[in-house]
Amino acid sequence: YEMSASLVGSEMCIRDSTLAVKVVGGPNLSLYLDIVKNGDALLSTDNLDYYEFRMEDPVNLDNRMQYVVSFRPRVSLMYALFIGKLYIDYERLSFTRAEFGLDMANRVKAVEAILHKKPVGLRFRPQEVAYLVTYKQQGTKTYLNYIRNVIRFKCDWKKRLFSSSYTAFSEMVVTDRTESPLSGISNKNTFKRKQVFYDLVDEYWNEDFWRNYNIIEPTESLENAVNKLRKQSN
């Protein structure tokens, strides 16, 4: 559960009446959501006992038939669980897609799973925490392809009549893949799962910061960025 909380955790601060939202996890956020590599995020042996699974009608995705398995909590725990669907390829029996979100039945548990800290007097009301993970076949294997995380919530101040709606959105797409021996990363250079990327990069808004790295600027749409990267690689 600790990992689940860190996936969607966020911090809030107020500057000049502007609400700033910081998502904890930075570059690691998407990698934690790879449910195949990180079974503890959803599919660990212990977690499976907490859910009720059901076979739904099969569907066709990209001209391939898929088993559809829906799941929802069958027990009540001290923390919020998930509701969603898993799509499994008929022939390969590998994951094609996972759609899941935080169970909002108990808003107190949902807040505990999402929010790390907020300003005094601010009321935080979660509306949705949704994830989408897709996988794509390359050769004889299926690899991670795309990850999206959406957090929708409302905030207002005590003694104020109206609330405001906000959305924190993050996504990752795999543009290219090469297989080569891995080299270890020193602990000093490792990005911790509870760190905030924005706080660690002093020149975050400096145009020269991004240079030629395979990184998408926060103000650029994912689709345009991917097309640009593909043109550069050709």
Put a short name on every predicted segment:
Residues A168-N234:
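Gram-negative outer-membrane assembly/targeting C-terminal domains
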Residues D40-L42, F53-E56, R64-L182:
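Gly/Pro-enriched, hydrophobic low-complexity segments
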